[in-house]
């Protein structure tokens, strides 16, 4: 049995390792060596992900969190049962939850500590593991919540070049780009099923014979959204959502209730590796993890250690629910086949 103190110490050490996107190797090494210290084989794959595979009973479950964080050092400290530090919520708290659920579950589990999630998801796009039956992504949903949908993400670039005229006679490149943005923004709305977004970069300057400008935007896209023709698309990941009647969602509902809480199903307006891995493997995916996502990327990032420890218990129960669901399905199938044989 792994003690609560060991679980807290692992998370503290993981958060202490500064690992912004592109600098994940030290944290990945720590995770691999920690698995090996518990007798679990682990390795670093070709793109830098930390991978551990445990053979056990039930369906194969991929637990995939991310090792990288956004930049910004927050001094790591524990005060009044709360751990402060960059990545404590997004998403080393969920990743540590997955680490211990892997160790404490006698199940078929693939653990993946992914790189570049805060960038262009190189880790998820190049993940080379056996096809899972279910995917759980490590992102803060709150200990009593499970995320069943994320909006998509589209990054596009616009360029304008306008021949010089007298300043009072025409619209320059910057104005054209701003007008283009206002046209796009006019279709924005609120919530999961609406388009939203922001300007990422806007540069405009005068050259010898023209006014030149570039604009990069990022849109959060609802399910079913298709980029307009003619846009220069730098990156596009479609929205993803799972049916709330999925066995995976039902397992979370039961696991959360078993630990004395009322489950909350969430759809988020951000984007995660769930958008990539769910469609890629063609199986149901949700996101789960301790922490308040409103603290993501902020200078106030911190996580309740009691919530973190409880999330491990919830996830272990969820995995047991999934094992039981497969066993029940096999029994029911066997009973049906036996019934057919007797009736024949």
From Swiss-Prot:
PROSITE patterns: ARGE_DAPE_CPG2_1 (PS00758). Coiled coil: none annotated. Zn(2+) 2 binds at residues 90, 118, 297. GO terms for biological process: arginine biosynthetic process via ornithine; L-arginine biosynthetic process; lysine biosynthetic process via aminoadipic acid. The active site is at 68, 117 (proton acceptor). GO terms for molecular function: cobalt ion binding; hydrolase activity, acting on carbon-nitrogen (but not peptide) bonds, in linear amides; zinc ion binding. SUPFAM superfamilies: Zn-dependent exopeptidases (SSF53187). The keyword Metal-binding applies. Its EC number is 3.5.1.130, 3.5.1.132. It is found in: Cytoplasm. Keywords: Amino-acid biosynthesis, Arginine biosynthesis, Cobalt, Cytoplasm, Hydrolase, Lysine biosynthesis, Metal-binding, Zinc. Zn(2+) 1 binds at residues 66, 90, 139. Pathway: Amino-acid biosynthesis; L-lysine biosynthesis via AAA pathway; L-lysine from L-alpha-aminoadipate (Thermus route): step 5/5; Amino-acid biosynthesis; L-arginine biosynthesis. It is an enzyme of class 3 (hydrolase). Binds 2 Zn(2+) or Co(2+) ions per subunit. HAMAP family: LysK (MF_01120). Catalyzes the release of L-lysine from [LysW]-gamma-L-lysine and the release of L-ornithine from [LysW]-L-ornithine. This is Putative [LysW]-lysine/[LysW]-ornithine hydrolase. The gene is lysK.
């Amino acid at each position: 049995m792994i003690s609560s103190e060991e679980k807290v110490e692992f998370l503290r050490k993981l958060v202490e390792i500064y690992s912004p996107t592109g600098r994940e190797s030290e944290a990945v090494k720590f995770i691999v060596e920690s698995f090996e210290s518990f007798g679990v084989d682990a390795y670093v794959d070709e793109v830098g992900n930390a991978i551990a595979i445990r053979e056990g009973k039930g369906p194969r479950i991929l637990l995939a969190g991310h090792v990288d964080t956004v930049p910004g050092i927050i001094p790591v400290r524990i005060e009044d049962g709360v751990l402060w530090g960059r990545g404590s919520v997004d998403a080393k708290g969920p990743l540590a939850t997955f680490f211990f659920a892997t160790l404490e579950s006698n199940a078929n589990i693939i653990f993946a500590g992914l790189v570049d999630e805060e960038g262009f998801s190189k880790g998820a796009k190049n993940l080379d593991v056996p096809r899972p039956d279910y995917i759980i992504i490590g992102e803060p949903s709150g200990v009593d919540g499970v995320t069943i949908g994320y909006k998509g993400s589209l990054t596009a670039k616009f360029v304008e070049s306008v021949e010089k005229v007298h300043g009072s006679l025409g619209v320059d490149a910057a104005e054209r780009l701003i007008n283009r943005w206002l046209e796009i923004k006019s279709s924005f709305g609120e919530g999961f099923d609406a388009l939203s977004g922001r300007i990422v970069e806007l540069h405009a300057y005068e050259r010898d014979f023209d006014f030149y400008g570039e604009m990069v935007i990022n849109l959060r896209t609802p399910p079913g959204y298709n980029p307009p023709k003619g846009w220069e698309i730098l990156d596009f990941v479609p929205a993803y959502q799972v049916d709330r009647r999925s066995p995976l969602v039902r397992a979370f509902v039961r696991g959360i209730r078993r630990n004395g809480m009322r489950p909350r199903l969430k759809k988020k307006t951000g984007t995660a590796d769930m958008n990539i891995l769910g469609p890629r493997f063609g199986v149901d995916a949700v996101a789960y993890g301790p922490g308040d996502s409103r603290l993501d990327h902020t200078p106030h990032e911190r996580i309740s250690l009691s919530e973190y420890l409880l999330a491990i218990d919830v996830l272990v129960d969820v995995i047991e629910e999934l094992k039981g669901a497969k066993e029940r399905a096999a029994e029911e199938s066997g009973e049906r086949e036996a019934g057919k044989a007797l009736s024949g």
